[in-house]
């Protein structure tokens, strides 16, 4: 039997993406309006903060899950990184395109870290990355965030063009979710 997961997120897109990546697991949102501050120095730090927060507010028999993710652009020295959500507020695509205007090195990667804290305080850390580059202009209607400008390695279209079916299998979050599923006890 798969463990039940309580996911500390208010982001419906992330919740649905995790559910699609782990179809056999019972995944529910924590359902709180007072998230902890994301003041960690790394994606793992922030994911752990959220997982521990969820653990403190969840039923005793579930795994509490926190996730942090973002995009790192090589030409921006890895920024926005852990500050992706704040950096991208409003118009993430426009801000990224403006930041890389005239820049030839458009290498970037999506990063996702998921931390799960079990009923006894045991911890599982799962990571997923998706390397690629930032396109010169936006294309596509599916996805969210930077998907309209992110072209994965080996592909010629943005994630927003490739679509949800592609993303369900190949995204940084899907990769981290699979690593989590492999690491959790059954």
Could you describe each region identified by the protein language model?
Residues 2-6, 12-186:
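Anionic-ligand binding patches
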């Amino acid at each position: 039997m798969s463990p039940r997961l309580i996911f500390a997120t208010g982001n419906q897109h992330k919740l649905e993406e995790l559910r699609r990546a782990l179809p056999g697991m019972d995944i529910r949102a924590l359902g709180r309006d007072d998230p902890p501050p994301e003041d960690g120095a790394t994606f793992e730090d922030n994911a752990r903060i959220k997982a521990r927060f969820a653990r403190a507010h969840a039923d005793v028999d579930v795994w509490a899950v926190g996730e942090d993710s973002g995009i790192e652009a090589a030409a921006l020295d890895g920024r926005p990184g852990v500050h992706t959500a704040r950096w991208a507020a409003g118009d993430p695509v426009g801000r990224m395109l403006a930041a890389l205007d005239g820049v030839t090195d458009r290498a970037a990667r999506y990063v996702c870290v998921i931390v799960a804290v079990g009923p006894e305080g045991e911890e599982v850390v799962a990571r997923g990355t998706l390397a690629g580059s930032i396109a010169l202009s936006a294309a596509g209607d599916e996805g969210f965030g930077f998907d309209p400008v992110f072209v994965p390695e080996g592909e010629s279209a943005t994630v927003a063009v490739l679509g949800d079916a592609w993303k369900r299998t190949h995204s940084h979050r899907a990769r981290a979710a699979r690593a989590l599923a492999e690491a959790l006890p059954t």
